[in-house]
From Swiss-Prot:
Alphabetical list of Pfam families matching this protein: RbcS (PF12338), RuBisCO_small (PF00101)
Any Gene Ontology CC annotation: chloroplast
SMART domains: RuBisCO_small
Keyword Nucleotide-binding: no
Further facts: The basic functional RuBisCO is composed of a large chain homodimer in a 'head-to-tail' conformation. In form I RuBisCO this homodimer is arranged in a barrel-like tetramer with the small subunits forming a tetrameric 'cap' on each end of the 'barrel'.
Identification of the protein by name: Ribulose bisphosphate carboxylase small subunit, chloroplastic 2
UniProt family annotation: Belongs to the RuBisCO small chain family.
Amino acid sequence: MASSATMLSSVATAACVAPAQASMVAPFVGLKSASAFPVTQKTVTGLSTLPSNGGRVQCMKVWPIVGLKKFETLSYLPTLSVESLLKQIEYLIRNGWVPCLEFSLEGFVSRDNNKSPGYYDGRYWTMWKLPMFGCTDAAQVVKEAAECKKEYPAAFIRVIGFDNVRQVQCVSFIVEKPE
């Protein structure tokens, strides 16, 4: 053990004292000239010329955070028509998910009662009746949503597709918003 330590220290001392040998490794003299590489594009000298894809890109506005709040899956699309709403509900029924209706007068998560998250901060909505187990008709779900809207006109109403085998919520989208 001691002999290997002295051997390492003597090698380290020899490496520090020994002069560099230029014949083993050539010194760095800089990058190769640009003429050695094929040039396929002209060089840009400033910001006057920017890359383009033929004019197909337009500047897109970022969604404003005040006044136009967004919700769940389909909230960035225009309001669903009755036909497209029926198609969405048929999709979740076709996948074997149970349609559920929920409503909330607030519609947004807010921490009015406490600084930590809890039950009354708006993330849990009230269920409208019971889940629609065995429902095979999308029109029945739309009828229930209209009935909920009639009773609570100032409420946000959403449809949830619940997978009762895996016990998870698979889809959720807003069907009614207050005026």
